[in-house]
Amino acid sequence: MTSRPDDDRERLARNLEQARNELRASFQGLSDEQLTRTGAVGEWSVKDVLTHIVSWEETALPDLARLARGDTAVLGAIDLYAASFDAVNAAIMSLRRNLPLDQVLRELDISHGDFMAAVARLPDSVLAEEAFGRLLIQITAEHDQEHAQHILEWRKTEGL
């Protein structure tokens, strides 16, 4: 039995929300000093990880709009699982690293809300199995979960 498009959309949205909740829980209770301490994830602070997540959503949002219009997604030209984003991440972090913590936390909520609203506007065809829109949504949820795990591992190592 195949699932109805509305059920599929709801499942994808729930997965996104669950992943974001895992991310939020991973840094819940940390002080401003702990959130901005470098070395939490590689050279990055937790704040850096969060602004990195915002930058990913901000990168993906125009493609969700393209897909909603029936246009081609720019990111669809690359294998998102195989591509190395190290140079892109470094360039974006050089621009975003000095943002204040309160702004990063605000943008984390805003970008997620914008992403969820964009997902709600997507036609069912973009959410079908093997469709790029579905992949983009799944990768975004996995991205939150991956970085939540990194933060939790750091907290365990630091006794936080």
Language model regions located:
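Acidic/His metal-coordination segments adjacent to aromatic residues that form catalytic metal sites
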Residues: 4-8, 46, 88-104, 127-133
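Short, contiguous alpha-helical
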Residues: 17, 36-87, 116, 121-160
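Extreme N-terminal tail/first-helix region
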Residues: 1-18
